[in-house]
Amino acid sequence: MTKQECAIKYITENYLNFNRLRHDVIADKLQIRIADSLENASLQNTPMGLQFSDEDTWREMTKHDINSIVCHAAQEYDANITSREVITALQSDLIPDVHPLREYVLSCHTWTEDQPDWIDFVARQVHVVDASNIDRTRGAVDRAEPCRSASPEDRPTGCSVSRKSTASITSDLKCSASETNYSEPRERSKADALWRICFKKWFVAMVASWMNDEVVNHQVLVLIGRQGIFKTTWLEHLIPPHLRAYACKLANSNDLNKDERLRIAEFGLISLDEIDSMNNRELNQLKSVITATDVNERAAYAYTKERRVRLASFCASGNRRDFLTDITGNRRWLPFEVESIQNPFFTTLPYNRMYAQAWALAQDPLFSYWFDLDEIEVLEQHNQHFRDETNEEQLLPILFDVPAEGKGEFMTTAQISERLVTYGNIKKPMALSRLGMVLGAAGYQSTRPKIGGQLIRGWLVYQRDTDEIASLKRLLKE
């Protein structure tokens, strides 16, 4: 036999025949299987005296592993085998490909509609603040009874899922708590209903994107709240422990470099910590990454650029509520202010069942894990509570009002900006184009009268007088 044939035979007889080698297509790396305990391993009919079970772990293959194969193969066949022959065999189709995330989802138990709603059970571990009460009082939602650890013997009751209750946010918000299929220890707030539906859609979309290269999860789940309430930890614990190598954190930076862009093809879940510290430029860059369907970059040590399919879903956490900056809309974000979260270190999530349910719903034609136009409208209204208003936006309703039909004073965007800046002593005024978006969103009518023989673009406004402004300021102080 040639040296190459010896290397192939050794790898086949000692590794491939016992499912000890595989190629991870997500990380594009070779993995080797090791026994959890060498002391307790059986010595019968297995290479190197090891017997493998489902609990045995896979790890990335190292240079030490390759050198060991070279030495053992050379010793067994008394041939001058080098690492070149071994690496050639390892980097071929002899090594089976595996997609660990898909492999796990397909290994989960089958879920049917008459079974408990495990995803909702997990969502109820997070208690959110009603967005309509955010500005008036904190902690407006009463705490729910603590959820118990989920196990086969400890199933949530009265928690079966129906397509009606999961397919649409708008229909769900119109239902009272007594009309739902959920058995709860507290009355559902609108924020709670919205949270549970959004979480389910986001989670199902995440699993669907793992299983189908054509699916991209365009939404970002965001938990906002004080420090130390397990926001980031809870999000990280949504991934089963043995798959957490396929989750990562993305650091805030002024520029998303090549390595950070490649992560959307290398990880199943990317967590954005301290999302509230990102500036407008960073958020805009992030939005382009969130909506990307693939990435075309040259990985480290690769010879050429390679198109890789987007895999990752995004989640985020932060402390400051007003982090959204886009005036035109923020439908990609699913932000919720958190009052409390059940300690994830003392809670066992029903991973097998929640992932089985997510995959079943992803394949159900009557369940939509995306958001339709009516649902997006609900989200936009909800997200207004998380938007960072500029100085101009805050001063606009104090100094101006939308005039009655057929009335109003004509002012250009520059004139309106000048008054806002002068009154508020604003050091860095917003761009006139952005102010125009603000005026349009606030309901002001755009018009183009002919002045001095030229068409001038502007707005019909009502300017408040000094007494009105003083009265409004007194009301705001109260």
Which residues does each PLM region occupy?
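Conserved AAA+/SF3 P-loop NTPase catalytic/coupling segment centered on the Walker-B
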Residues: 267-291, 324-329
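Long, low-complexity, charged/polar intrinsically disordered regions in eukaryotic proteins
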Residues: 347-383
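A short helix-turn-beta junction within AAA+ P-loop NTPase domains corresponding to the substrate/partner-engaging
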Residues: 324-343
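P-loop NTPase catalytic core of nucleic-acid-dependent motor ATPases
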Residues: 92-141, 177-265
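DNA transaction DNA-binding modules
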Residues: 132-142, 146, 153-154, 168, ...
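N-terminal nucleic-acid engagement/recognition segments and initiation subdomains in replication
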Residues: 1-133, 176, 193, 197, ...
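Conserved catalytic/switch belt of AAA+ P-loop NTPases
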Residues: 283-306
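AAA+/SF3 P-loop NTPase mechanochemical coupling elements
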Residues: 260-265, 299-317
